[in-house]
């Protein structure tokens, strides 16, 4: 690794210099100076990686290191270096979005060693190149969206390409490195990353410690506007809060009071513009012996907006908002997207209207958080994967007690746990959750994915401060044995940039309900903090604290302006239900774009939201990797843009689960993963005039 500091350009030796000279001789080049976009705050950190000791894709770990369950360590655990934090962040984020087991496909169907044709030819898969790192800000010093551009050494300036890799979830800037960055780097494309203004920013309130852009720590006051995130709390209020609620943490997505989701499309476009600047710095002509001119202008570079989950939603929003031709095409997986639905839109399955579609996340996530623990007790869900560190008896008690409390509140019917659980599950079905996702209702709550999302997004959509303790929830370190809030043996802050996902519980920081001094929300009351879950639900149903307006601010119109686009989603997705996301978006697109639309949709049976869960017993036997189809979709789009190959029409892809014994499923093979068909026949999804009909 070579670092030349902030704002200085990297040159990769004679070969790259020769490319720059050739570029300067091109008569089509302009003498206009390449200027850093005005939204870039401060200077740019530029770092070169040799592809041996360190690299763009694996941080020097290679295929073997990324595949190891042992995280890369720190020489000094209390003060890790920025290079160590980057390595850990790449390791953890890569692994968070794909199945890392060999039987599940890592190293065979995907991975640094697997080439674009699916063959094991790339060895350890290390990729040399340059990174450009900077903040985007609005002048306030409080936005500080992290932008990162990776330019591989194999980038061809005569045939330039960019792929966006907007972070999934609320992850840091490397959050989509396996979902989109890897494919792009193998194609020789520059990668435009951004953290969406959530960025895993944490603020340890008692020590007033924050992270900087590279994950290293600083005092919040001393850091000032260089902080990734500092809670907007006066010193007096902070002292009062710390005395009443010690060992608490603020997180950027939840507590920035900026509703960052409303800007996800905008910052994705900024990441592309920043990538143009970086490419002009490397390949633009020299105009005065030291400064570079503009070789590439908006629209000159083939750019695919790509990512998954929240990053997928951001990509769609960016394509809708693009007015300068920054984005050529879109390829997204399982997009979390809130669609502004026309009243005449219809979503059908097997010719029959589905009971509910197009709900925003604020609606379905708070409902699921309320009902899932009870629904999980249904006998029809027996054998669902168990995804909790709690004893089974504790989890069963939570389910029974949540059902009883829901019944007492008149929110479910039934005289016993089984009838109450059946009613809770029926309500989820009525709210648009597919029966295909039934066996995932329990693990989505048990893993705390749904509670975490409900709390974080409720805070964001109400622009709440950390000191508000919205619905009596907060984020804190706890005693592992009891769940009670407690001072940590060692602060989680040194590693939070490396291992955190931005949505507690994460990186040793838990989601707590503030009963007494505060307890893990699952253990705070017998019914797992029902009062807090009901409060979150009522914020939406009663339109409280500005939530409806802030949710409306994140909605999109499903107008991609005629850009070719592919959406891939698993039918069994129970985190972002397909009726509310992809199906709704495609149906609305039929009105918003009508005849201009070039959008196709591939719905994957036996596909769910978290490929990283696939090694878990019961996941391995039932579900297939959606990531595989995301990669196929990217390849299809590449051939479409480069060669004019038609995109296969919208269709259901009927996969075959691996089966076998939970925890010991047979190895994934191509027989489990049928190709996307050019002629899907009876599996074709019908789309038009505001209606979508998905075959059963």
Curated annotation (Swiss-Prot):
Role played: Participates in the degradation of poly-3-hydroxybutyrate (PHB). It works downstream of poly(3-hydroxybutyrate) depolymerase, hydrolyzing D(-)-3-hydroxybutyrate oligomers of various length (3HB-oligomers) into 3HB-monomers.
Any one of the GO BP annotations: butyrate metabolic process
InterPro entries: OHBut_olig_hydro_put (IPR016582)
Catalytic reactions of this protein: (3R)-hydroxybutanoate dimer + H2O = 2 (R)-3-hydroxybutanoate + H(+)
Enzyme Commission number, as recorded: 3.1.1.22
Top EC group: hydrolase
Subcellular location(s) of the protein: Secreted
Catalytic residue positions: 309 (charge relay system)
Cellular compartments per GO CC: extracellular space
Disulfide bonds: none
Pathway participation: Lipid metabolism; butanoate metabolism
Organism from which the protein derives: Burkholderia lata (strain ATCC 17760 / DSM 23089 / LMG 22485 / NCIMB 9086 / R18194 / 383)
Name by which UniProt lists this protein: D-(-)-3-hydroxybutyrate oligomer hydrolase
Coiled coil feature spans: none
Family: Belongs to the D-(-)-3-hydroxybutyrate oligomer hydrolase family.
Superkingdom to which the source organism belongs: Bacteria
A Gene Ontology molecular function term of the record: hydroxybutyrate-dimer hydrolase activity
Pfam families: 3HBOH
Alphabetical keyword list: Hydrolase, Secreted, Signal
Keyword Hydrolase among record annotations: yes
Signal sequence bounds: 1-20
Secreted keyword on record: yes
